Amino acid sequence: MRRWLLALVLFIALATASLTVYHNLSASDRRSTAAIERTRDLAILDQRIEFYAARVVKEPHGALDIGRLSALYLQRGRQTGSYEDLSRAETAARTSYGNRKARNSGAAMVLAQSLLAQHQYLESYAVTCSVAALDSTEIEPRALKAELELELGRYSDAAASFKSLEAQKRQLPVATRYARWLEIGGHDIEAREMLFAAESLASKQFRMPSEQRAWFHLRVADFALRHGRLAEAASALSRGYDVAPDDYRLQALQARLDAARDDWPGVLRAGNQTIAQVLDPATLGLMADAAAIQGDSAGSAQYARTMLVAVAAQPGPYHRAAALYLLDHHGDLPEVLRRTEADARVRQDVYGLELLAWAQYRNGQVAAAMQTIDRVLATGVNDAQIEFHASEIASANGDNARAATLRSKARSDNASLVALRRESGH
């Protein structure tokens, strides 16, 4: 017993010393260390995928090895942004679950998560509901079900799902999803506090893959940026870089932060680091704007064309960021409206309805746009872009007083919104 206790004390002492050394490193050294570790971890992940892929070739009708392979593909897809790996994860998980449904909820969850990552919301929801129904005590399926209800805009169902998760709302599988639910209802203070708590908890999970820990920093940064807290967003991004300095999701958000700061060369720097890994349509649209603002019309047009190519190559529904770019840059307005209407028939979430309202407005359907944006505002969400679009629609509808109120609220919620600053001549 004493020997076991001594070993435990020694382990804790060594772990504490290692953490102390790590935190005393400069930011540059921490990121260099993290980059080396991520390269090593990705190489190990590649080897594990090769190992299980070889086993599956020998035993294609099993479930366990194929299920493990699907989880590894999903992990690599998340880390690298590879759509091919997400598709491989879906195929392997579907095969594993098809081979054996009993005691194989892990494969079903990988299937649901890979479908969600490819924006196949309805099928992901169906799979998740079937898993959640098998065991109501499992947190992850219930939390994913609630998240998908938010994605689909089924807010009554989401309310019931999150109510059932109230006791677990601080746990990592639930916390960021619960925070998003709070934000949609206008409870921003509680949402922010919950995101910070989840980030702090995740940062201590050293066995958690780096891309997952980085994701919690990303959520804090994204919330801060959308609410005009630029220094807070930059700080969260810095913490994310300490974990995953080459994470394309962090770089994409960095480009958005640079745009909010009018740092258009910075947008292109961060954007180039993003698209070197993943042709993200939202980032390409932002880069097109950055190039245009700096007088590079040819470069702007090239980024815009690349964005359209990237959208065409991606699976799933129409990319919302690309749709917004086209609406604001005189693209094919009737086609964008048609695609946006099709998306809204599946997803009735606030951001999809906001985009539909903006497409209706750009196509001259002002009355319909007002009805649609009113549905969004009725949720209580505080979002400067939504309020800016609502103010434009209200003005076109002849309600100048309401337009002014909405514009004022947008400035209060996020004065750094690019559209607001352009209007002010900044």
Specify the residue positions occupied by each region the protein language model found:
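Structural motif corresponding to the intra-repeat A-B loop/turn of tetratricopeptide repeats
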Residues: R76, T80-Y83, Q118, L152, ...
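Generic helix N-cap/helix-start motif at coil->alpha-helix transitions
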Residues: A63, R100-A108, L134-R142, K169-R177, ...
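Amphipathic alpha-helical segments of tetratricopeptide repeats
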Residues: T91-G98, A133, E166-A167, E199-S203, ...
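TPR-repeat structural position
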Residues: L45, Q79, L86, Y121, ...
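Residue at a conserved register position within TPR or TPR-like alpha-solenoid repeats
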Residues: Y73, T80, L115, E149, ...
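N-terminal leader/linker segments that initiate helical-solenoid repeat arrays
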Residues: R2-G106, A126, T405-H426
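Alpha-solenoid helical repeat scaffolds
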Residues: D46, E50-A53, S87, R94, ...
